[in-house]
């Protein structure tokens, strides 16, 4: 074989290998999100105006400083509005404002995990120690001394699996926001980084520390909100051979057109980041730095890729991601997930360990049950939902093909009722 033919063969093989990974093309071709009049997709304009009035009234009542709200049906944007201010200095909020979405990152991380699962890279019930050996032989916390943080532990009765990490049943904790003071103290002493940071820390370094700490309980025994999705961010690096940030950029954000979503923002987009605000004597003020620097998306080392809480995004970008799910895993002729995989992700993965029966928990999604639907105002059975630490929320109803997103950036108690009102009122706009 000549050198030229050898080179051509090499190129062909490489191209074939590229097509066998992550997202693939499909004969089905759903369009990117476009704007349409409400009546064209059977939503009531008058009832959408009620939502507009409710949000404006919330500003007058001073329960929120600002919000961006977006409603999509059948892949068409029928409502996309910005209200109030982006900071305490009176800067007007814009529709393309960028928000810290915190735990809404979990759905994106879960999606990336399942894209690799579709390639046959692992099984959901594989022990995580098969890929991250430091998690071998986990221990469960037994006794703890508050005076000096010494503790005793016992061997866990089973290994932590990938499914456990996706469903918050691994027994891992959540450091500074953990509900157990003992875990807060242990995580702090170990120097784990939770949620967000501007320090030169990597997710690998944090995961290595997590692996040495005791668990809340035996894996699979309880639902305990945790850093499991952060562990899976590093797991994606191990499996893919890419940084977690690069994997998401190449296989999700770029092909979906989510141009304003990422762990960190370039300087050119820094002025679009909404300030976090809190109430002081009934007046909105910019939130100060506490256990985290509020400007983490635009300053610092920019090396910590938190799969559980680290992303920032816009309402339209996140709606695009959710629309891919409502399309059965496809958008614009690109297939990201099979509809059969999505069915697995939305199935009850934790049985009766999660919630009060109104929702079950899938693979990083809360999913509305028949009992929840019967209570009203929450969507159809199968509607999937979640939110973020800074007062962001989303829901997507596969039956009615509706997406609702409301994004704010607040901390502390404010009297805000816009989230439940928004969801309830969106569902009443259906006019078919």
Task: Name these PLM-found stretches.
Residues 1-28:
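Bacterial Sec-dependent N-terminal signal peptides
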Residues 29, 36-101, 121, 140-145, ...:
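Short, conserved catalytic-motif segment at the N-terminal edge
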Residues 55-56, 69, 75, 99-128, ...:
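Active-site SXXK
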Residues 68-70, 80, 100, 164-167, ...:
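Structural recognition of the beta-strand scaffold that forms the well-ordered cores
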Residues 139-381:
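Short, surface-exposed loop or secondary-structure junction motifs
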Residues 383, 390-400:
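Short, surface-exposed beta-strand/loop micro-motifs that present aromatic residues
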Residues 410-421:
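A short acidic/glycine-rich loop-to-helix N-cap element
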